[in-house]
A protein has these predicted regions:
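Short catalytic-loop micro-motif centered on adjacent basic/acidic residues
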Residues: 99, 131-136
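Active-site beta-loop-alpha junctions of metal-dependent nucleic acid enzymes
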Residues: 78, 82, 99-124
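Short conserved beta-strand segments at catalytic cores or DNA/RNA-binding microdomains
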Residues: 62, 75-76, 81-98, 103
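Structured nucleic-acid-interacting core domains from mobile-element enzymes and related host factors
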Residues: 60-70
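Basic, flexible linker segments flanking DNA-binding modules
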Residues: 3-62
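C-terminal domain-tail junction helix/linker
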Residues: 186-252
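RNase H-like two-metal-ion nuclease catalytic core shared by retroviral integrases
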Residues: 135-137, 144-150, 159-183, 191-203
Length: 252
């Protein structure tokens, strides 16, 4: 290695590409090494941001009577995007946050969620609940049809994307993620999460009163502003104030 001006990994790469006369069997240590797995990322749909930028959202709001926005994001555990994640949906009009447990941060899992929502709620209710969706440029979100037309038929909603490196544009959801981190601190593995645990966590978070809501809870406002079908589908229930517990042992 001292006579070759390259690192060990580069040398092994040259052997694989047959740039040198030696073969892998001549290198016992090389044979024992496992190849690194390349991360499989979802590729963006070409032109996915056309007419869907944050500036387009502001223009749309200025000319539209409907300003109900649902913010969308993903919260990762210790396993990152390849491990279990939480898909989060935040209704600005009442601060209600929905949580969905996904096996990983992949587009097919996000699609499954929105296919389910459309199937269970029906096109009209889906369109009323999600008139505008605002999300970031995460690879699992870069196909607008996942949200606008989950069953690949009529366009039911409009999706817009934040500017790169501008998570503040959906800052209310980012702020609301703090409630999740009270229960699942950063660095916590999501491997032991179940739908039942996620639902329990969601109900405790949505039953927490907020000063920004004049002392009301997101659950209370959601009963007034959101369709009852959604409340039933997500098994949303109020937790008494004296039983709210936003700590890790809630889901132990």
């Amino acid at each position: 290695m001292e006579d070759i001006p390259c690192c060990q990994r580069t040398l092994y790469s040259y052997v694989d590409k047959q740039y040198l006369s030696v073969i892998n069997l001549d290198l016992p240590r090389k044979v024992r090494y496992k190849k690194r797995k390349k991360k499989q990322l979802d590729t963006p749909v070409p032109g996915y941001r056309k007419n869907r930028t944050y500036r387009d959202l502001l223009d749309f709001l200025a000319s539209s009577h409907d300003s109900s926005i649902v913010e969308l994001d993903v919260v990762e555990g210790a396993g990152g995007k390849s491990g279990p994640v939480l898909l989060t949906l935040f209704f600005r009009n009442c601060s209600l946050m929905l949580l969905f447990l996904l096996p990983g941060d992949r587009r097919k899992y996000v699609q499954d969620v929105f296919d389910l929502l459309l199937s269970e709620l029906g096109p009209q209710t889906y369109s009323q609940l999600f008139p505008i969706i605002l999300t970031d440029n995460g690879s699992s979100f870069l196909d607008p049809s996942l949200f606008e037309m989950p069953h690949r038929q009529d366009v039911l909603t409009k999706v817009f994307y934040c500017d790169p490196m501008s998570s503040w544009q959906k800052g209310r959801l980012e702020k609301n993620h703090e409630f999740i981190r009270y229960i699942l601190p950063k660095g916590t593995s999501f491997d032991s999460l179940t739908e039942q645990k996620v639902n329990l966590m969601m109900n405790h978070i949505n039953s927490t009163a907020r000063a920004s809501l004049n002392g009301c809870t997101p659950f209370q406002l959601a009963l007034l502003l959101l369709d009852a079908k959604l409340m039933s589908l997500m098994d949303l229930r109020s937790v008494p104030a004296d039983q709210i517990h936003l700590k890790p042992d809630l889901i132990k």
